[in-house]
C-alpha cells in the first residue's frame, strides 16, 4: 500500500500501457500452448473459451484506445477555443461598448425630440402664443421691410416692463412697512374713559345707556313682606300672623 500511495499520475500513465501490453502477450501465449484438434472434447472447449476471452479483451482495448484518441482531440479543441477567447475577448468587449454608446446616443436623441415635441404641442395650445404669431404674420404682410418682428419684440418689451413695475411696487411697499414706526401698546385709548376710541364707554352704576335711571338690585332676603320676622325662637306669634299662615 505504501508503494502504491507513492505513485504519482505520470507514473500511472506510463504503467497503464505496459500492463495492457503484458496482458495481450500473456493472452497470446496461452492460446499458442493449446494445439488445434479436429475431435470434440476439452481441447475444443478451451480453444473456444480462449478465443472469446481474446476477442473481449481486444474489443475493450480498442474501445479504450478510441476513447483516448477522442479525448486527445477534444482537449486540443478546448485549448484552441480558450486561446481564441483570450485573444478576441478585448475585441468583443470593445464592440459591445461601441454598440452601447450608439444605443445611448440614439435614446438621448429620441428623448430630446420627444421633449421638443411636447413643448411645441404646449405652445400651439396656448391662445396667447397663437395670437402673437398671427399678429406678427399680419405685421409682416403689412410691412414687408420689417425684419426684426417688431410686434413680437414690442409685446415682450411690454411684458418685461410690467414685471419691472410690479417688482418696484413690491420693493416700495416693503420699504414703507420697514420705515413705519411701531405703535405703543396704549395708543388709541381714550384718556377720559380708559377705553379704545370708537367704542362706547361703560356706563356708571344706576345709569343705563339710554340715560334712564336703573333701580338698584336688592336681594330677596332684604325685600319687605307682610310676614313678620321672628328674631327670638320663644316669641309667641301674633294672631294676625297666625291667620295669614292658615288662610
Swiss-Prot record:
InterPro entries: DASH_Duo1. Pfam families: DASH_Duo1. Residues 152-180 form a coiled coil. GO terms for cellular component: cytoplasm; DASH complex; microtubule; mitotic spindle; spindle pole. Residues 232-247 have a biased composition (Polar residues). Component of the DASH complex that connects microtubules with kinetochores and couples microtubule depolymerisation to chromosome movement; it is involved in retrieving kinetochores to the spindle poles before their re-orientation on the spindle in early mitosis and allows microtubule depolymerization to pull chromosomes apart and resist detachment during anaphase. This is DASH complex subunit DUO1. It comes from Saccharomyces cerevisiae (strain ATCC 204508 / S288c).
Amino acid at each position: 500500500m505504501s508503494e502504491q500511495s507513492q505513485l504519482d499520475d505520470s507514473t500511472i500513465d506510463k504503467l497503464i500501457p505496459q500492463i495492457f501490453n503484458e496482458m495481450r502477450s500473456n493472452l497470446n501465449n496461452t492460446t499458442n500452448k493449446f494445439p488445434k484438434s479436429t475431435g470434440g472434447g476439452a481441447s475444443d472447449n478451451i480453444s473456444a473459451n480462449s478465443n472469446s476471452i481474446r476477442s473481449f479483451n481486444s474489443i475493450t482495448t480498442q474501445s479504450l484506445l478510441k476513447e483516448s484518441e477522442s479525448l486527445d482531440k477534444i482537449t486540443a479543441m478546448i485549448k484552441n477555443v480558450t486561446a481564441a477567447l483570450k485573444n478576441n475577448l478585448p475585441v468583443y468587449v470593445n464592440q459591445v461598448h461601441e454598440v452601447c454608446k450608439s444605443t445611448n446616443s440614439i435614446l438621448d436623441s429620441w428623448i430630446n425630440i420627444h421633449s421638443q415635441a411636447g413643448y411645441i404641442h404646449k405652445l400651439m395650445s396656448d391662445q396667447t402664443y397663437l395670437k402673437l404669431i398671427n399678429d406678427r404674420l399680419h405685421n409682416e404682410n403689412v410691412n414687408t421691410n420689417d425684419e426684426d418682428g417688431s410686434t413680437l419684440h414690442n409685446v415682450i418689451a411690454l411684458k418685461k416692463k410690467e414685471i419691472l413695475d410690479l417688482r418696484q411696487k413690491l420693493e416700495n411697499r416693503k420699504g414703507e412697512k420697514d420705515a413705519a414706526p411701531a405703535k405703543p401698546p396704549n395708543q388709541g385709548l381714550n384718556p377720559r374713559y380708559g377705553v379704545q376710541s370708537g367704542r362706547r364707554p361703560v356706563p356708571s352704576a344706576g345709569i343705563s345707556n339710554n340715560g334712564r335711571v336703573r333701580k338698584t338690585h336688592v336681594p330677596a332676603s332684604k325685600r319687605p313682606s307682610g310676614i313678620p320676622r321672628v328674631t327670638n325662637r320663644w316669641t309667641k306669634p301674633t294672631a294676625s300672623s297666625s291667620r295669614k299662615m292658615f288662610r
